[in-house]
Design a protein with these regions (language model features):
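Short, surface-exposed coil-to-beta transition loops
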Residues: 11, 27, 39-43
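Short consensus segments that form the blades of beta-propeller domains
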Residues: 2-6, 33-39
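Acidic/hydrophobic-patterned starts of short beta strands in beta-sheet-rich repeat architectures
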Residues: 19-31
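Extracellular/periplasmic catalytic domains that process cell-envelope and extracellular macromolecules
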Residues: 19-20, 38-40
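Short, flexible beta-strand-to-coil junctions
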Residues: 30-35, 48-50
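Long, contiguous hydrophobic alpha-helical segments, chiefly transmembrane helices and signal peptides
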Residues: 1, 26-28, 46
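Acidic, small-residue rich beta-repeat scaffolds with periodic aromatic anchors
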Residues: 41-44, 48-111
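Beta-propeller blade termini
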Residues: 9-18
Length: 111
C-alpha cells in the first residue's frame, strides 16, 4: 500500500530577522509525497518578509544503499532550487540561513 504524506515541521517554523533590517522573516518548511516506494518526498521552504513570498523547492535526501567496504551511504535527492524572489534578493544572510534550514531537515531516515 502507498501512503500519501504531507508533513509540516513545527520545529522549523521560525520568526527571525536574519538580515537585521527590522523586518521579520517567517519561515515554514514542509514535505509532500507518496511513501511506499524509494522516491524522495518533495520538500519546500517558504519565507515571507514584508508581505513578499520567497520559496526554495527540491527533494529530501534518502539512503539508497550502503557500501560495506567504504562504510559510506549512497543517497538520492537533496537538491534544491530557489524561486526568482530568492535569487533576485541577493541577500547572502537570508540565503545562508535558508541553506542551513534546508540541510537540517533534508535527511529523512527510512524505517
Amino acid at each position: 500500500p502507498l501512503d500519501i504524506s504531507g508533513d509540516f515541521f513545527s520545529e522549523a517554523f521560525q520568526i527571525t530577522d536574519v538580515n537585521q533590517n527590522n523586518l521579520s522573516e517567517v519561515w515554514i518548511l514542509y514535505k509532500l509525497g507518496c511513501r511506499g516506494g524509494v522516491d524522495p518526498l518533495d520538500m519546500k521552504i517558504i519565507m515571507y518578509e514584508n508581505g513578499k513570498k520567497y520559496a526554495m523547492r527540491g527533494t529530501e535526501k534518502i539512503i539508497i544503499s550502503y557500501n560495506k567496504n567504504t562504510k559510506n551511504n549512497n543517497y538520492t535527492g537533496g537538491k534544491y532550487t530557489y524561486d526568482e524572489a530568492f535569487l533576485n534578493s541577493k541577500d547572502q544572510k537570508i540565503l545562508e540561513f535558508s541553506k542551513k534550514l534546508w540541510n537540517k531537515y533534508v535527511f529523512t531516515p527510512q524505517d
